[in-house]
Regions:
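GST-like domain detector, emphasizing the conserved glutathione-binding G-site
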Residues: 1-121
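GST-like fold's C-terminal all-alpha helical module
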Residues: 97-164
Length: 164
């Protein structure tokens, strides 16, 4: 498998760390969706990071979908709890971490990539108003719960929140 994308992306980091923790071998190709647009487009015409090129050539994108695939490949190893209550709590934290990532990336795009004369202050305030509650809820969360099997490895919620 080959993971395509820059490690400055929290989504690419999330996939890379998770693949390592699951014990799945992969090659990483550090390719920017900005500076390497044409090369990225030749791999994935949608130009979305992370992109995973599977061993059979199938191209997957979106960190959550890639990790769903990885979880199935790695069975019985998993970064998610087996029990429904534990899974529900883990997915709640993953959702908060993903929301924090998404809103932080939106703010970076708005503040660093959009020309100053085209920025819309109410939009930035709205995005910040979504980011801060997600981070506040994560601050007190119990993230260091071991995944199934009594392993001392971090679970998916801890990985997702750490890279956010």
């Amino acid at each position: 498998m080959k993971l395509i994308g820059m490690l400055d992306s929290p989504y690419v980091r999330r996939v890379a760390i998770s693949l390592q923790r699951l014990g799945l071998p992969f090659e990483h190709q550090s390719l920017s969706v900005f500076r390497g647009f044409s090369e990225f487009e030749s791999i994935n015409p949608v130009v979305k990071a992370p992109t995973l090129v599977c061993d059979d050539g199938t191209v997957l994108m979106d960190s959550s979908l890639i990790l769903d695939y990885a979880e199935r490949l790695a069975r019985p190893r998993s970064l998610l709890p087996d029990d429904v209550a534990g899974l529900r709590q883990e997915l709640r934290l993953v959702g908060l971490g993903l929301a924090a990532m998404e809103k932080a990336v939106q703010l970076v795009y708005e503040e660093r990539l959009r020309p100053a004369e085209k920025r819309h202050a109410p939009w930035g305030e709205r995005v910040g108003g979504q980011l801060h509650p997600a981070r506040r809820q994560l601050e007190g969360a119990q993230l260091l719960q071991a995944p199934p099997g009594g392993s001392d490895a971090l679970g998916q919620a801890a990985i997702t929140v750490a890279v956010a």
